[in-house]
């Protein structure tokens, strides 16, 4: 197992960027390495050029190309201290702190300075949230219905007009990007030549302009015949979709159709057209006038025999609103119907002023979602070639994408009758798939009155995560003939915004119980944020529990939250330890592999050296045998005391007796050149340490006297040969 030479490993820290920003923020507060001074309304702000240039296109154009010395930048009067101070804090901490007092100023400064990574929809959402509905309702009196401009056509006539609808006109209307809005047409219609800024760019616009825009939407059918034909087509489609769902409603209100017709006739048509006109430009600024355009707020209750629907009801007695839109519109609000049984209509007490204010404030959070869903429903109903298979696939994908959000949204579920369960489930899935256009998360900060907005890579829907704070839960049961209002369940203030860490980690004991724990959190109302429970130390946590009087359910919930967070941290540490062990094992394996490679190289080197030594020894023996003319007796003695591995073992051959000494030695040495060295003969072990020169001299002496010496001298000669063999054996043993 060897690693590739081209393998590259990268370590990525998840806290490096955050720590760098925090360090830069500390330097800014201590005026360390700051190289630019910003003057806003006479107040002085110190900062770093690189940070400002990276966060704002305005500062980038002002800073790039300047000298390296101290730089002073005075911002124009459009930028205020109240709006600039949160922005410079955002540049260094990635947290934008907004309140009701500074949201307008911050919005203007963001637009003027071109600050990056801030969603504009965040400000639009807060504008409606911080809007004081009581003051605005007093400034903008209720308008009466324009029955002359909004004459409702008969249902059968609308069905016939749909067949005559010209497709090219509808496509031209949808593709025309420069079409005039109802707001502009109204001002020309009323003779008002003064132009006002768009709703999405104006932070101080009141409900007065919204009421004017409502009048424009009501008067629009008389101005544009093409659009009137277009909205009739949408109206008939909606009737076909919701006809089976609201059949009983239509039957119960049919005797009073004419008394309600004048006020309720044109509202759905105008509503549809307004949504289609303003959807792409201003999703967040469109729906407030829709809430004002309600039947309960426009028609006098004393003139009709039927009690009008409440403030936030979107049911039209004639069925022009599909039931799916009803579910989308009223899922997060209080939906109270008058009891209807056997076509007997019971009058209901009108809503008081405080109820209207609370419902209007609660609905203002859902308006962007409703507008987007209304547009989606119109487009999906109008396209007749969309098959049911595609809808099922879209529903499946939407459920899979928003499964985490839906698991925390348990108190906001709808309980529908079998007649409308299918439509309701389809619209709920559409609702879940409509949120990704708004990529912000709103988390509760420990300080009261402050919220932190963060742009996320994994999109979280702010409306679903915060509507429970304003009372989002309601249970609606719709029967075939009767409508019974359910009491509103008190939601948990922190139920939908609890974030206990990364849910994508490996399952632990706490994660396996996450579903039941979250349900418990939604049922138990906690007096403080769950994030505070996790972040406190043990002593601070105990003191916090002593400060509050908590019920056993609340204590169980708090301890469960803290236990699950500790389990998650312990699991992370365990995974880190395992990763460290794996890395240590990998390093040890690499060391062993390198040692093995070095040992193999050393072995190859030793084998090559041994081969060279054997070759040298064989050549040496051959040379000695050539120089020493051995007699027949000497050869026999040498062969007798030599081992089989000795280079001189050729003397054992029987051919040696008949062949001369010189002719025998040469070929035998060549043939046995690769054999290992010989072992010491027994008679030569006494002379074990003579040198090479001494052995050679003894051989020469024995060679010179071999012919003249007698049998007594042969022992001496054999001792010289033994010395020679001993020398050769010692050398071979040393080399090995």
UniProtKB/Swiss-Prot annotation:
> What are the protein's GO molecular function terms?
DNA-binding transcription activator activity, RNA polymerase II-specific; DNA-binding transcription factor activity; DNA-binding transcription factor activity, RNA polymerase II-specific; DNA-binding transcription repressor activity, RNA polymerase II-specific; heme binding; ligand-modulated transcription factor activity; RNA polymerase II cis-regulatory region sequence-specific DNA binding
Family (UniProt): Belongs to the bZIP family. CNC subfamily.
Q: Which InterPro entries match?
A: BTB/POZ_dom, bZIP, bZIP_BACH, bZIP_Maf, bZIP_sf, SKP1/BTB/POZ_sf, TF_DNA-bd_sf, ZnFinger_BTB_dom_contain
> Which residue ranges does the record annotate as region Disordered?
286-312, 349-389, 680-719
PROSITE patterns in the cross-refs: BTB, BZIP, BZIP_BASIC
Per the record, residues carrying Phosphoserine are 196, 364, 445
Q: What modifications follow translation?
A: Ubiquitinated by the SCF(FBXL17) complex or by the by the SCF(FBXO22) complex, leading to its degradation by the proteasome. Under oxidative stress, reactive oxygen species covalently modify cysteine residues on the bZIP domain of BACH1 and release it from chromatin. If the BTB domain of BACH1 remains intact, its beta1-alpha6 degron is recognized by FBXO22, promoting its ubiquitination and degradation.
* Biological process (GO), any one: DNA repair
Q: Domain bZIP: where?
A: 557-620
Its Gene Ontology cellular component terms are:
chromatin; cytoplasm; cytosol; nucleoplasm; nucleus; RNA polymerase II transcription regulator complex
Q: Which residue pairs form cystines in this protein? A: none
Task: Show the ranges annotated as biased composition (Polar residues).
Answer: 696-708
The protein's location, in the record's own words, is:
Nucleus
What functional role does this protein have? Transcriptional regulator that acts as a repressor or activator, depending on the context. Binds to NF-E2 DNA binding sites. Plays important roles in coordinating transcription activation and repression by MAFK. Together with MAF, represses the transcription of genes under the control of the NFE2L2 oxidative stress pathway.
Region ranges (Basic motif): 562-578
Which spans does this entry mark as compositional bias, Basic and acidic residues?
A: 286-295
- Per UniProt, which keywords does this protein have? Activator, DNA-binding, Nucleus, Phosphoprotein, Repressor, Transcription, Transcription regulation, Ubl conjugation
Q: Tell me the ranges covered by the BTB domain, including all copies.
A: 34-100
Enumerate the residue ranges of region (Leucine-zipper): 582-589
Name of the protein: Transcription regulator protein BACH1
What binding partners and quaternary form does the record give? Heterodimer of BACH1 and MAFK.
Taxonomically, the superkingdom here is Eukaryota
Primary location group: nucleus
């Amino acid at each position: 197992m060897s690693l590739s030479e081209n393998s590259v490993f990268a370590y990525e820290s998840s806290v490096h960027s955050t720590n760098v920003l925090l360090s830069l923020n500390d330097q800014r507060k201590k005026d360390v390495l700051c190289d630019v001074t910003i003057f806003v309304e006479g107040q002085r702000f110190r900062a770093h050029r690189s940070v400002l240039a990276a966060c704002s296109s305005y500062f980038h154009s002002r800073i790039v190309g300047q000298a390296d010395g101290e730089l002073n930048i005075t911002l124009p009067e459009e930028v205020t201290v109240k709006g600039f101070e949160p922005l410079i804090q955002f540049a260094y901490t990635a947290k934008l702190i907004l309140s009701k007092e500074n949201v307008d100023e911050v919005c203007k400064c963001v637009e003027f300075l071109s600050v990056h990574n801030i969603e504009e929809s965040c400000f639009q959402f807060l504008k409606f949230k911080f809007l004081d509905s009581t003051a605005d309702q007093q400034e903008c009196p209720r308008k009466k219905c324009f029955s002359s401009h909004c004459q409702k056509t008969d249902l059968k006539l609308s069905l016939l007009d749909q067949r005559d609808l010209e497709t090219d006109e509808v496509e031209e209307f949808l593709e025309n990007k420069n079409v005039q809005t109802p707001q502009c047409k109204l001002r020309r219609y009323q003779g008002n030549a003064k132009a006002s800024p768009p709703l999405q760019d104006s932070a101080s616009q009141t409900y007065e302009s919204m009421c004017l825009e409502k009048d424009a939407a009501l008067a629009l059918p008389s101005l544009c015949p093409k659009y009137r034909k277009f909205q009739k087509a949408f109206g008939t489609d909606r009737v076909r979709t919701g006809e089976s769902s609201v059949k009983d409603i239509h039957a119960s209100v049919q005797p009073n159709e004419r008394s309600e017709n004048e006020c309720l006739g044109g509202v759905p048509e105008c509503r549809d057209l307004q949504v289609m006109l303003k959807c792409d430009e201003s999703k967040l600024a469109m729906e407030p006038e829709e809430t004002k355009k309600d039947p309960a707020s426009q028609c006098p209750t004393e003139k009709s025999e039927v009690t009008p629907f409440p403030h936030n009801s979107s049911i039209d007695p004639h069925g022009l609103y599909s039931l799916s839109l009803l579910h989308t519109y009223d899922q997060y609000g209080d939906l109270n119907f008058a009891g209807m049984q056997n076509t007997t209509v019971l009058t209901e007490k009108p809503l008081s002023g405080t109820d209207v204010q609370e419902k209007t404030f609660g609905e203002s959070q859902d308006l962007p979602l409703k507008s987007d869903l209304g547009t989606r429903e119109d487009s999906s109903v109008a396209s007749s070639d969309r098959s049911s298979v595609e809808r099922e696939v879209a529903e499946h994908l939407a459920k899979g994408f928003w499964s985490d959000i839906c698991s925390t949204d348990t108190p906001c579920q709808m309980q529908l009758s079998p007649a409308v369960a299918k439509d309701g489930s389809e619209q709920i899935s559409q609702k879940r798939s409509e949120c990704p256009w708004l990529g912000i998360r709103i988390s509760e900060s420990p300080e009261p009155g402050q919220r932190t907005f963060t742009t996320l890579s994994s999109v979280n829907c702010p409306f679903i995560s915060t509507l429970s704070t304003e009372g989002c839960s309601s249970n609606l049961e719709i029967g075939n003939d009767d409508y019974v209002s359910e009491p509103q369940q008190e939601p948990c203030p922190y139920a939908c915004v609890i974030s206990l860490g990364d849910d994508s980690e490996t399952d632990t004991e706490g994660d396996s119980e996450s579903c039941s724990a979250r349900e418990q959190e939604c049922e138990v109302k906690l007096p403080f944020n769950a994030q505070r429970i996790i972040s406190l130390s043990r002593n601070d946590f105990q003191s916090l529990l002593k400060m509050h009087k908590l019920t056993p359910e609340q204590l169980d919930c708090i301890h469960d939250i803290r236990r699950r967070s500790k389990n998650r941290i312990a699991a992370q540490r365990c995974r880190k330890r395992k990763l460290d062990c794996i890395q240590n094992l990998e390093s040890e394996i690499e060391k062993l592999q390198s040692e093995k490679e070095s040992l193999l190289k050393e072995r190859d080197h030793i084998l090559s050296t041994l081969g060279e030594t054997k070759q040298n020894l064989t050549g040496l023996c051959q040379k000695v045998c050539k120089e020493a003319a051995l007699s027949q007796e000497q050869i026999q003695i040498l062969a007798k005391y030599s081992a089989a591995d000795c280079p001189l073992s050729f003397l054992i051959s029987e051919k040696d007796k008949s062949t001369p000494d010189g002719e025998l030695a040469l070929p035998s040495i060549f043939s046995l050149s690769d054999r290992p060295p010989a072992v010491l003969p027994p008679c030569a072990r006494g002379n074990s340490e003579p040198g090479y020169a001494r052995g050679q001299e003894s051989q020469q002496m024995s060679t010179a006297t071999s012919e003249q010496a007698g049998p007594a001298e042969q022992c001496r000669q054999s001792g010289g040969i033994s010395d020679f063999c001993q020398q050769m054996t010692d050398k071979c043993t040393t080399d090995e």
